Amino acid sequence: MDPSAPECSTSNPTAPKAGIDQDGEMDSGYLSYYATQSRMTDPGRMAGLLDGLPKNFAALRQVACGLIIHYRGGNPLQHGIPAERMREIDSRYVETMLTRLTELKDGPLTGLRSPKEKLVGCCRDSTVLFLAMGRALGIPIRARVGFATYFVPGYYIDHEVAEVWDAEEQRWRLVDPGIGDDFVSRDGVRVSYLDLPPESFLLAGSAWQQCRAGTADPEKFMVDPGLEVEDTRSWPQIRHNLVQDLAALNKTEMLLWDTWSGSQQTLTDRDLDRLDRLAEQTSATNPDIAKVIRLYQDDPELQVPATVVSEDPLGGPCREVTWLS
């Protein structure tokens, strides 16, 4: 556990009391909520690194994209990164990430970095760094967990992106801070990474609803088609992402391999009803945040506990991790 991480509570006491106005639009209370740092995104003593960043989310996305090398897709070992550095994937807090990034290369975050000068991580890490940058500028921004269609044709791949409030257009945009400007999918499609449409990124709630309705095949949802681990595909992965997305909407941006009772339970009829209600509240890019926060606060099974079980994507044993004290 990082002792320097700021205190917070899983009951989310900082959630605003304001709600959605009569037109269904996000009010200033919730915009302010998402414009402030969470326990995970707080830069702490490294806050100075976020000074002087670009003032718009498009440029911020480019900065965040240049800080992470993906632990699988980026082939870090082939770039000469020592195997012991693979444990950087467990960097839970932005303060920890920024500290390590300055060790790898001193100077502003906007500078170009070689693969060896980037932090080994995944989409979640690009996202929380992007969140920290946006929130430092007062931009309302939050993480969303779901499935991308632009990595492996025909499959929905486990992924985390950001959702940014566009003040000019008065709407939320799904933005992927983990792919480069020149990224093209394997089937030759260029991705609208600054405004992902539903056919490119399916929110976990929508994935759950479509699979429950029979309009999508749950066997197409997974971490990686080449990964033959039962819990990383089909219903277990969809359920896991659904619970992770609820936590993210409550500004509790966990590692993607963190699990707790709400994400790994054996499903009963009661559980299915609960998850159906959860999917109903989180399946859109403009959910009723008052209901989302209330759902999280009222159901202990869905809340992230102080101690979680963190699985090891590198193949090691699971570990109990206390992230909240």
Positions of the model-derived regions?
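Selective for proline/serine-rich intrinsically disordered segments
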Residues: 1-4, 11-14, 298, 303, ...
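Linear, non-domain "peripheral" regions
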Residues: 2-78, 95-102
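His-Asp-centered catalytic microenvironments across diverse enzyme cores
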Residues: 27-40, 61-84, 102, 147-160, ...
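A near-ubiquitous, low-amplitude feature marking generic local secondary-structure context
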Residues: 43-47, 81, 110-113, 117
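Active-site neighborhood of thiol-dependent amide/isopeptide-bond enzymes
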Residues: 87-160
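Substrate/cofactor-recognition hotspot
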Residues: 295-325
